[in-house]
């Protein structure tokens, strides 16, 4: 395992102003998602959704704590370009765990952004690697590089037959859900093939950015085998949420402010069923982040 770089050692390896710009986009992605309202079952500006243990302010504090760690993921990605990509993840883990600890300190123990630390950590490390190798930094190359980092991850961590199964292992064995690991190892297909093109198309049509993002969240909810939902509601809860999101999309989705009433109703139903599509929220963060990548001129 390579050591984690602490201080810049070479200006060509540590383009700090660029790293800070990309990190700022990732931080803004987390804030954009949590402030987006109304979201079914999720914490937003209006209520706490199906969560009784967290509030909007927890997410704001969490995002701020994570923000300082994001450039370090990039630094590590840039520092280990001689490693094969599948060997990078082992060196990222200590950074991810330290970032998680900072999140838990900021939220007094509430898990607000653990999934985003995983996905944004991978993407930020991919940025560092691609920048150092002078390769294009696009949504496609970032997702492909993240997939290379995670090669074999699902088999290693979900297919084990431990005496004490983790929540992820249990959902994999019972329902075949691979969660955040599987999505990352596959190169974020729900984002690259579905959510990102959908979001970009709505913006190109002149749609309101917030309404476009809410509609994109519905699309993710309709397609994603969300382990957050399945852990709360089982296969029946997941099927219901996917089908209801699909129904709203077939009815036209979220195109005007008048359509927000359907999201308010959906939110109330999620609260009653104790369902929270946190995995889809994490993928929405990835979607928004990748949609903004071209803003950084490198």
Curated annotation (Swiss-Prot):
Keywords linked to the UniProt accession: ATP-binding, Nucleotide-binding, Transferase
Gene Ontology MF annotations: ATP binding; triphosphoribosyl-dephospho-CoA synthase activity
Entry EC number(s): 2.4.2.52
InterPro entries documented for this protein: CitG, TriPribosyl-deP-CoA_syn_CitG
Domain of life according to the entry: Bacteria
Record-level GO BP terms: prosthetic group biosynthetic process
Catalytic activity, as annotated: 3'-dephospho-CoA + ATP = 2'-(5''-triphospho-alpha-D-ribosyl)-3'-dephospho-CoA + adenine
Keyword Nucleotide-binding among UniProt keywords: yes
Annotated HAMAP family: CitG
Family: Belongs to the CitG/MdcB family.
Name of the featured protein: Probable 2-(5''-triphosphoribosyl)-3'-dephosphocoenzyme-A synthase
């Amino acid at each position: 395992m390579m050591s984690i770089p602490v201080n810049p050692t070479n200006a060509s390896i540590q383009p700090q102003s660029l790293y800070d710009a990309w990190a700022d986009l990732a931080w803004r992605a987390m804030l954009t998602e949590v402030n987006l309202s109304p979201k079914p079952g999720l914490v937003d500006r209006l209520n706490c959704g199906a969560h009784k243990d967290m509030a909007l302010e927890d997410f704001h504090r969490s995002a701020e704590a994570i923000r300082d760690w994001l450039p370090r993921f990039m630094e590590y990605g840039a520092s280990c370009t001689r490693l094969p990509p599948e060997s990078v993840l082992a060196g990222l883990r200590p950074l991810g765990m330290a970032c998680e600890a900072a999140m838990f300190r900021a939220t007094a123990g509430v898990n607000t952004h653990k999934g985003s630390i995983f996905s944004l950590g991978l993407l930020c490390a991919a940025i560092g690697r691609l920048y150092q190798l002078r390769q294009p930094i696009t949504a496609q190359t970032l997702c492909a590089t993240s997939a290379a980092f995670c090669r074999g991850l699902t088999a290693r961590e979900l297919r084990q037959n431990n005496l004490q199964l983790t929540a992820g292992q249990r959902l994999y064995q019972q329902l075949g859900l691979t969660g955040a690991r599987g999505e990352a190892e596959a190169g974020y297909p729900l984002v690259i093939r579905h959510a990102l093109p959908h979001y970009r198309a709505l913006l190109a049509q002149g749609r309101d950015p917030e309404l476009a993002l809410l509609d994109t969240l519905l699309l993710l909810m309709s397609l994603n085998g969300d382990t957050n939902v399945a852990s709360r509601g089982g296969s029946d809860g997941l099927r219901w949420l996917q089908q209801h999101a699909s129904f709203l999309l077939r009815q036209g989705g979220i195109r005007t402010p008048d359509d927000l009433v359907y999201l308010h109703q959906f939110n109330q139903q999620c609260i009653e069923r104790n369902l929270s599509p946190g995995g889809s929220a994490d993928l929405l963060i990835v979607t928004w982040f990748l949609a903004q990548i071209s803003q950084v001129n490198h």
